[in-house]
Amino acid sequence: LAAGNAVVWSPAASTSVCAVKLAECIVDAELPAGVFNLVTGPGSVVGDEIVASPGTNAIGFIGSTETGYKIAERAAGKALLLEMGGNGPVVVLDDADVGKAVEASVIASFLCAGQSCTAGELFLVHEAVHDEFRDKVATRAQGVRLGDPFDAATNMGPLNNEPVAAKMDEHVRDALERGAELVAGGARVSGFPTQLYYEPTVLDQVSEEMEVARDETFGPIVPIRTIRSEDDALATIEESPYGLLAAVFTRDLARGLRFAEAARAGWVNVNASSNYWETHLPFGGRAGSRSGIGRVGGRFAFDSFTELKSVVIDLG
């Protein structure tokens, strides 16, 4: 809209009611008829038609990698801005302020029950501070209060839907079968109006072949993998199919900046939660990764929703 385009919005089917409420606000703003349009329904039907329509010139999408790939295939030749999945590596180096790293990690993994593309998904912790980090983050996880999200005393609400919860179940099960140690949580919680409440979970002794180390869990989980050096962490980030965001903790700012430059991610936070980002800065995945293409944030999204035109004039 800000770039001068008419918009057709197809929200996730599970958020249709919220989308309608927002659309009502937009209608109340008295935009000209036809400038903003809302179409609800299954993405495989409604979204597919919108993406493939000859009248659609550019597509912006935030969601799963699998859906993003389908959109890219259907929208061949059109401008794309795709912000997709991540495996948010959080790196705790040997000189880190462990207390600060723990508090930031709790936010990274348990804010919105871990249902964020910027959530902490894999914790690469140096062996020198591993035990302290593990014990402290487990204590914080056990102190998280589950409940009604509208209750001010609640720290964490439920997962969004059954497929998300089932994926959390699968990642925990797979990790434990492959030798991970369950330090905290690890199961759904009964006694709530829905079976989608999940214990804040901490896993230790995570290894590279586990699903939780390779894929996006999208749940309240802290999977810890021990590293012996910065190079170990950088190699793990390099090998990941994702490349959206990373975080690193160190008391040495110069070291943190060197790490940020070397890490193959579209965004790196130094001594801050992976969930922290500034909306005016460019945000998106590294080239060739499963995390998307293009950049959201401030003026940078305009690159995908405007035409760059060259005009040559002969003044002779």
Specify the residue positions occupied by each region the protein language model found:
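Structural detector of well-ordered beta-strand residues that form the stable sheet scaffold
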Residues: L1, V8, N37, L81, ...
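Rossmann-like NAD(P) dinucleotide-binding subdomain of oxidoreductase/dehydrogenase enzymes
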Residues: L1-K100, I227
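Hydrophobic alpha-helical packing residues
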Residues: A19-L22, F36, G86, V137, ...
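Hydrophobic packing residues within well-ordered alpha-helices of enzyme cores
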Residues: A19-L22, I50, I71, F133, ...
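Conserved C-terminal structural/oligomerization subdomain of aldehyde/semialdehyde dehydrogenase
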Residues: L31, T56, V91, R145, ...
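Short glycine-enriched loop/turn motifs at secondary-structure junctions
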Residues: A33, S53, M84-G86, S116-T118, ...
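Conserved residues at the C-terminal ends of beta-strands
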Residues: V39-P42, I62, A108, T250, ...
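ALDH superfamily catalytic-core signature
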Residues: A58, E66-S207, E230-D231, V270
